[in-house]
């Protein structure tokens, strides 16, 4: 079907059961990327969610508003965008109850008139990407002064159609990292446990950015 003019040269996939162990998570995505590049086919990650094999965060059972699940999912997003070269990324479910599959927690009222919902850091970590990386953005190279690690620092960068550059940095570690960017920083947006369930705007300091422990930070540049 690749030769049909009305069929997009793209393959869509679901990422379930591909996140552990960590070396496998990266290797299988690189293999997917290399295979699709041979045929000039794009990849979309069209569904992802916490499952029972995600033992690092206790599997899927029980809702979690904290950075534990949010960082875990941010690491997935990073690997899908950087190593699988995904051109699009979608989460499975907007609202959930006693499971880690909802961006919002539903407290289970039986009527639709007066129910209660609560947001999570998972929602806002998704926002670190989706609010600032615009449609048709192109991923560009970024070089860290320290080795990238799935249990430490991970970073990706994108150029939006308007020319602005967005970098999303994940700090999985327990120590602060200070990064210096080559462009003037116009905005810094933080998600961590201390910031609460929101994207917290931070003061800019020239080209230097503080990335707190256990956080996701979006840096917007000229």
Language-model features, listed with the residues they occupy:
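Loop/turn elements at helix/coil->beta-strand transitions in domains of secreted/extracellular proteins
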Residues: 6-9, 38-42, 84-89, 135, ...
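Flexible loop/turn segments at secondary-structure boundaries
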Residues: 17-22, 50-55, 96-101, 174-177, ...
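Alpha-helical scaffolding within the catalytic cores
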Residues: 1-2, 25-34, 71-79, 150-153
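Aromatic/acidic polysaccharide-binding cleft in carbohydrate-active enzymes
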Residues: 42-131, 140-146
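C-terminal beta-strand-rich structural cap/linker in extracellular carbohydrate-active enzymes
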Residues: 202-222
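Carbohydrate-binding surface patches
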Residues: 146-184, 214
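Active-site neighborhood of glycoside hydrolase catalytic domains
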Residues: 1-52
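Solvent-exposed beta-hairpin/edge-strand motifs
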Residues: 183-197
